């Protein structure tokens, strides 16, 4: 008899890559509006390269971009990017269709629910809370808990 169901978070419960893409695109446009002298395509390409080198959850990506360009961080441009990123990320943080209904159905059937994710603990819990899922899962295991990435 099945007693528990374990889910991944990103790209299973929520379309992480679409959310990330919308957030980065908004940040790029805001940084350009604040004085970053790059085309949107060039800025996005540089940001994608930083993510490839440092990991998709790298929190200092805009700092790194600005330092690479100016040899310092321009806080006006950085702040514009961060605010736009956060606003777009929150707007795009929605579960895939039928996820909420499925989770509720599993809970009603008495199953325990868990999440195993490669995301850092803070990022995972922010996503779960943003989705309203923080009270649904009995166990959440993050990269910070194990120090190991999923296969």
Where is each model-derived feature located?
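A short, charged/proline- and glycine-enriched loop
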Residues: 1-2, 110
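N-terminal helical cap/lid subdomain that shapes the substrate entry/recognition surface
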Residues: 2-97, 122
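Ser/Thr-centric signal marking residues that sit
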Residues: 12, 102, 117, 142
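Class I S-adenosyl-L-methionine
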Residues: 25-32, 104-107, 125, 129, ...
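Substrate-recognition "cap/lid" segment bordering the active-site pocket of phosphatases
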Residues: 92-94, 114, 120-151
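Catalytic-core regions built around general acid/base machinery
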Residues: 98-110
């Amino acid at each position: 008899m099945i007693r528990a169901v374990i889910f991944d978070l990103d790209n299973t419960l929520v379309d992480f890559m679409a959310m990330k893409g919308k957030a980065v695109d908004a940040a790029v446009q805001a940084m350009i509006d604040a004085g970053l002298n790059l085309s949107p395509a060039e800025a996005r390409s540089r940001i994608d390269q930083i993510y490839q080198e440092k990991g998709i959850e790298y929190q200092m990506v805009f700092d790194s971009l600005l330092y690479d360009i100016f040899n310092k961080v321009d806080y006006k441009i950085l702040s514009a990017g961060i605010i736009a990123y956060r606003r777009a990320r929150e707007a795009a943080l929605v579960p895939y269709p039928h996820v909420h209904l499925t989770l509720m159905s599993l809970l009603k059937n008495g199953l325990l629910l868990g999440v195993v994710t490669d995301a850092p603990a803070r990022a995972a819990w922010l996503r779960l809370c943003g989705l309203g899922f923080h009270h649904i899962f009995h166990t959440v295991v993050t990269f910070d808990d194990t120090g190991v990435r999923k296969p």
